[in-house]
């Protein structure tokens, strides 16, 4: 009788657990289905139908290092239709704005970010970063891109890579690839699912690495590679034709083998120059690491962490940031020395006329969207680039890399009106771009009040629940990917 009673209790407990499990699965699957329909209710609206005339502005030419002074800018349906020498155009139907002598540059591109929240795109826009390239694509990013293209809300343009293709032993948030055949399959699936480029890590074996590049050429999709060096066993020539190479830190960790070798660095720079492939240094993320290592909690206290997605904040706290907070003084000093050498690597690459791009790695280690882009630009300047060279890296170089320079990347008639207006000349100090008094997004005028509203809304990010649902969607999608 006693055994029968125990058996009955076990059976009842199991039934309850089964019911709760089924309910949880139903809730998760239903929530995933609803992701296509659920959006925050405080996203700013797109409103760019009016013709815009901006008088009394100075146009910065990113191709020639010149300024066209005292111009009038005419924008219609999001396109620059005229740049007049005087205030010629006038219309009762147009919105006329006095530019008050502002300097106008193209909107900035951040070519290496990690997006974990729609609000990151709003925060980027508030800082004049009108386009970003997200290098760890998920289904949610394709969803956000479609929403932006449909004009459902106001945010930066987004270019979305595939999920990161990585070798055996990678963590669950990457797509593991263990054979050349699987590499080819992942490329085809990424292309058919709407991703715009392939992102692959550098420690893939040479045969997988070469298979991915070969298949990408066949289906006409670009490839960005982690680390400006070939995979082990592959030739430098295998890197030709890639869209970009990421992280100068990997020059130090890869071909330099952790040696502060200036002579060998110059030889490597010659090899990189011969590739004709742009480099994205991502200095800001290493500087952030260095500050975490040296100043620890006192540095964290200076950051406005309310801008970070709550789930992403927890993941970064436990799996990334925590490792640098336990560094001893010797390790901290090493990071300072290494950071200075990374600046030297960028200088040598620039001296060898390697095309450089601005990419902050924003989203890693508490780096904040938007402001991280400007920090990256300042670090490029510290590396020896002129203000003009930094501006080129953040605008026309990026547009050329993405093959969209016929529509973006300069202030020119016929191009999309994604622009920044600042009160002081950015060719005198690139830091002036950090505080725009206005941004124009696809022809929509965003004054200081609107930019402030974007920043304010960006703090009200996605809930923990919906962030988890997005994560589960990604894991399930890639399990079937």
Kindly give the residue locations of the regions a language model identified.
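Divalent metal-coordination and catalytic microenvironments
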Residues: 57, 73, 78, 101, ...
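Active-site neighborhoods of metal-dependent hydrolases
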Residues: 195-197, 256-383, 475-481
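Divalent-metal coordination cores built from histidine and acidic residues
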Residues: 35-40, 99, 103-104, 121-229, ...
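N-terminal Sec-pathway targeting helices
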Residues: 2-25
């Amino acid at each position: 009788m006693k055994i029968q009673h125990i058996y009955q209790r076990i059976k009842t407990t199991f039934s309850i657990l089964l019911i709760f499990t089924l309910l949880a699965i139903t809730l998760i699957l239903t929530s995933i289905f609803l992701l296509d329909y659920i959006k925050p209710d405080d996203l700013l609206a797109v409103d760019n139908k009016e013709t815009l005339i901006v008088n009394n502005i100075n146009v910065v030419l990113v191709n020639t290092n010149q300024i066209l002074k005292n111009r009038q800018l005419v924008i219609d349906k999001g396109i620059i239709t005229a740049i007049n020498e005087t205030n010629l155009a006038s219309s009762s139907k147009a919105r006329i704005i006095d530019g008050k002598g502002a300097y106008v540059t193209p909107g900035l591109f951040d070519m290496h970010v990690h997006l974990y929240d729609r609000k990151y795109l709003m925060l980027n826009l508030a800082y004049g970063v009108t386009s970003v390239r997200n290098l760890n694509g998920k289904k949610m990013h394709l969803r956000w891109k479609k929403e932006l293209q449909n004009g459902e809300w106001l945010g930066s343009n987004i270019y979305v890579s595939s999920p990161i293709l990585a070798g055996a032993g990678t963590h669950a948030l990457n797509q593991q690839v263990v054979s050349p055949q699987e590499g080819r399959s992942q490329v085809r699936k990424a292309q058919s699912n709407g991703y715009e480029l392939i992102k692959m890590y550098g420690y893939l074996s040479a045969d997988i690495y070469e298979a991915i590049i070969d298949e990408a050429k066949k289906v006409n999709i670009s490839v960005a590679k982690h680390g400006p060096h070939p995979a082990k066993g592959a030739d430098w020539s295998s890197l030709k034709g890639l869209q970009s190479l990421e992280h100068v830190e990997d020059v130090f960790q890869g071909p330099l083998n952790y040696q502060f070798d200036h002579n060998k660095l110059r030889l490597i720079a010659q090899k990189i120059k011969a590739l004709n492939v742009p480099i994205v240094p991502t200095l800001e993320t290493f500087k952030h690491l260095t500050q975490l290592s040296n100043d620890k909690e006192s540095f964290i206290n200076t950051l406005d962490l309310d801008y970070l997605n709550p789930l992403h904040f927890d993941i970064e706290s436990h799996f990334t940031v925590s490792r640098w907070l336990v560094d001893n003084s010797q390790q901290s000093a090493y990071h300072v020395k290494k950071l200075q050498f990374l600046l030297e690597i960028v200088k040598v690459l620039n001296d060898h006329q390697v095309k450089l791009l601005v990419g902050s790695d924003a989203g890693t280690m508490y780096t904040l969207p938007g402001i991280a882009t400007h920090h990256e630009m300042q670090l490029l300047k510290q590396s020896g680039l002129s203000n003009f060279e930094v501006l080129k890296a953040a605008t026309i170089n990026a547009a050329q890399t993405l093959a969209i320079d016929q529509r973006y990347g300069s202030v020119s008639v016929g191009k999309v009106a994604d622009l920044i207006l600042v009160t002081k000349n950015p060719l005198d100090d690139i830091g002036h771009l950090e505080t725009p008094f206005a941004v124009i997004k696809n022809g929509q005028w965003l004054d200081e009040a609107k930019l402030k509203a974007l920043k304010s809304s960006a703090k009200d990010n996605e809930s923990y629940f919906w962030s988890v649902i997005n994560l589960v969607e990604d894991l399930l999608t890639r399990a079937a990917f």
